[in-house]
Design a protein with these regions (language model features):
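Glycine-rich FAD pyrophosphate-binding loop
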Residues: 22-46
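Active-site/ligand-binding neighborhood in enzyme catalytic cores
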Residues: 112-240, 249, 257
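Conserved Rossmann-like nucleotide-cofactor binding loop
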Residues: 13, 37, 261
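Dinucleotide-binding Rossmann-like beta1-alpha1 core, especially the glycine-rich loop
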Residues: 48-126
């Protein structure tokens, strides 16, 4: 049997593609998923009464069609709105509200003055040209102190590469605050939460973790998903003009929602895209569950830029998962930094899970490389959609948006 469409991966992007296509009457379609269940980075586990979200997802979007898609499968009544969101940054021996540049007024006056002077003297304010790599851009935009004490160490821990290797094409993920606003917030001793780039008042399921949303979306699509099926071989049959997957499945069109470096191996490492693939890298994250003797804070999560801390983020589960056991916290740590014998969070370590892939690393040259890869395969009807297919640090609402758009535009073409 030759499928009209074959989707690689049944995470949020793959599920959206599958559901949207079937809604449009396309039934000659199959998704291959390496795991035993759908959902990818949006899955949740129960561990000794605690809920653990693999990716720490919350739902908020500016796109009505994305809201409609989610709430059609998982009604809004089964969610609640986290308002206010409480996210902190550990810095200078204390916790400051996120984002740091909007909340410098929460620091002691002597520290606040030093940070403000650093911001005022940034390269942008001095009229210097805009840099092309991340470290130089952060110094240019926010000054040396925010750069050296927060953003550089945090992003070094998160990405697992040196800051000068990072591009600037992902900085839309960072709140864009001007010098005048930084000064105003400090004088008024308040911030504008509407400046958050996302998730200022997110929705979250009333029970079961964010994975319940994925289960609801996947419920009617399971018959079109082949689980426990990793793509180990992918080739294009020039005679039949079809893709052959694992020497078992054939498809006229293949839509990839998985990391391209993994697919490159399954293709036999074609020389034509070797140079581009070398610029496409991703990291892995270890999600660790801890149980404490009491609830240490009312935060939803906290960023940890300190290099002496293994992990880079703490999520206080019982503060946002209503049916999770009390006193549970899960941390996120770049897999290359993780040592189970040297965890730095204080609590009983109950569970560690390493994601097969967590974040596409925004390396210099990444965007040009992925564009070339997508262009190369387009004529053979192999496409890429979502966080992994486009190799961009998309939140899951953007993955849904791009999947919906792909189906609409593909059918229109």
């Amino acid at each position: 049997m030759t499928y009209e469409y074959l989707i690689l991966g049944a995470g949020i992007t793959g599920l959206t593609l599958l559901k949207k296509m079937r809604q449009k009457g396309i039934n000659n379609i199959l998704a291959l998923e390496a795991e035993k269940e759908a959902g990818g980075l949006c899955r949740s586990f129960y561990v000794e009464g605690h809920v653990v979200d693999i990716g720490g997802h919350f739902f908020q979007t500016k796109y009505k069609e994305v809201e409609d898609f989610i709430f059609a499968s998982f009604p809004k009544e089964k969610m609640y709105k986290i308002d206010p969101r409480i996210s902190k940054i550990s810095i200078e021996g204390m916790d400051v509200d996120y984002p740091l540049e909007s909340n410098l007024w929460q620091l002691p006056v002597d520290k606040q003055i030093k940070y403000l002077i650093s911001v005022i003297r940034n390269g942008e304010a001095l009229g210097k040209p805009e840099p092309k790599n991340y470290e130089e851009w952060i110094r240019w935009k926010l000054g040396d102190m925010i750069c050296d004490n927060y953003l550089l160490p945090y992003n070094t821990k998160l990405w697992g590469v040196t800051p000068d290797e990072l591009d600037v094409d992902w900085i839309y993920k960072i709140p864009r605050v001007e010098v005048e606003e930084v000064l105003r917030y400090s004088l008024e001793r308040q911030q504008d939460v509407e400046k958050y780039p996302c998730h200022n008042r997110p929705y979250y399921p009333l029970s079961g973790g964010y994975g319940r949303v994925m289960e609801a979306i996947a419920k009617d699509e399971l018959q079109n998903i082949k689980f426990n099926t990793k793509v180990t071989k992918l080739r294009f049959d020039e005679n039949e003009q079809v893709w052959v997957i694992n020497e078992e499945y054939k498809a006229k069109n293949v839509i990839n929602t998985t990391p391209w470096p993994d697919l490159y191996e399954a293709m036999g490492r074609p020389e034509a895209i070797r140079e581009q693939i070398n610029k496409i890298k991703y990291n892995k994250v270890v999600v660790s569950l801890f149980e404490t003797d009491d609830n240490p804070t009312n935060y939803h999560w906290r960023y940890r830029p300190e290099m002496e801390q293994q992990h880079h983020r703490e999520l206080y589960i019982s503060n946002f998962v209503k049916d999770s056991k009390n006193y549970g916290v899960f941390t996120e740590t770049n897999a290359n930094r993780f040592d189970a014998n040297k965890v730095t969070f204080k609590g009983r370590n109950l569970f560690n899970y390493t994601t097969p892939a967590a974040y596409p690393i925004p390396l210099v040259g990444r965007t040009v490389a992925i564009t070339a890869i997508l262009d190369y395969f387009k004529s053979k009807h192999l496409y890429g959609v979502g966080r992994w297919g486009e190799h961009q640090h998309h939140n899951h609402d953007i993955c849904i948006k791009h999947a919906l758009d792909f189906v609409d535009n593909f059918q229109a073409s």
